[in-house]
């Protein structure tokens, strides 16, 4: 007995409706927003408990954030709107599209990574430098996804690195190292300046990191210097 072959119309899956596509997109954005909010809570907890592992968890999610930075930049704008006021809000929103408007609070899913300690996170102002550094980092990542925004990314990242160095908080070490990495990336992508024009600043950052026993930034700067010496033959 041979089974009757299915017709092509029977094999084909029913096409996804436009409404389903919109619903899926809304769900993805809501999930992205929930992860962003959770990450800010982790940063606050990192300061409250003096535990760098919470910041490390936030940084580990950066590849996912980076993949969707351009498509969901309006979600990041909503986080900026919720988190900051005054000059910092204006500084960040000028680089982003209009904020995303959730359909309803009930439709915003919570990420599975949420744990019971989320409710014990301190007030936002206690972790403000860490949250600001993280959101600036995300905005820089978004700007780097657009070649025409390289100058804006460089300016914002440079300012963020300066603020991290000036604040001298150990809870900022991991985020500061990431900002230094993306600052070097900005210069590498610049056809005029290149990484060699950042050499003096990198050497200054290395000295500061060594004095503060900031191993994260020190390692990042050393890698950038070695890359500059090898690739650009700038000694």
Residue ranges and their predicted role:
Residues 2-235:
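Extended alpha-helical scaffold regions
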């Amino acid at each position: 007995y041979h089974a009757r072959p299915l017709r092509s119309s029977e094999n084909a899956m029913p096409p996804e409706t436009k409404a389903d596509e919109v619903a899926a997109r809304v769900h993805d954005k809501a999930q992205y927003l929930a992860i962003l909010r959770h990450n800010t809570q982790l940063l606050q907890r990192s300061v409250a408990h003096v535990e760098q592992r919470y910041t490390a968890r936030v940084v580990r999610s950066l590849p996912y954030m980076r993949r969707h930075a351009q498509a969901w930049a309006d979600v990041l704008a909503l986080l900026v709107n919720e988190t900051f006021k005054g000059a910092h809000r204006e500084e960040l929103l000028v680089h982003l599209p209009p904020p995303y408007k959730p359909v309803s609070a009930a439709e915003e899913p919570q990420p599975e990574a949420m744990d019971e300690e989320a409710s014990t996170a301190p007030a936002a102002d206690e972790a403000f430098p860490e949250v600001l550094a993280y959101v600036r980092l995300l905005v820089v990542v978004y700007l780097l996804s657009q070649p025409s925004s390289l100058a804006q990314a460089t300016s914002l990242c440079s300012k963020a690195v300066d603020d991290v160095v000036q604040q001298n908080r150990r809870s900022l070490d991991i985020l500061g190292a990431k900002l230094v990495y993306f600052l070097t990336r900005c210069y590498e992508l610049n056809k005029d300046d290149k990484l060699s024009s950042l050499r003096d600043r990198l050497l200054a950052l290395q000295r500061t990191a060594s004095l503060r026993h900031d191993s994260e930034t020190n390692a990042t700067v050393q890698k950038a210097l070695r890359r500059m010496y090898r690739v650009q033959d700038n000694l």
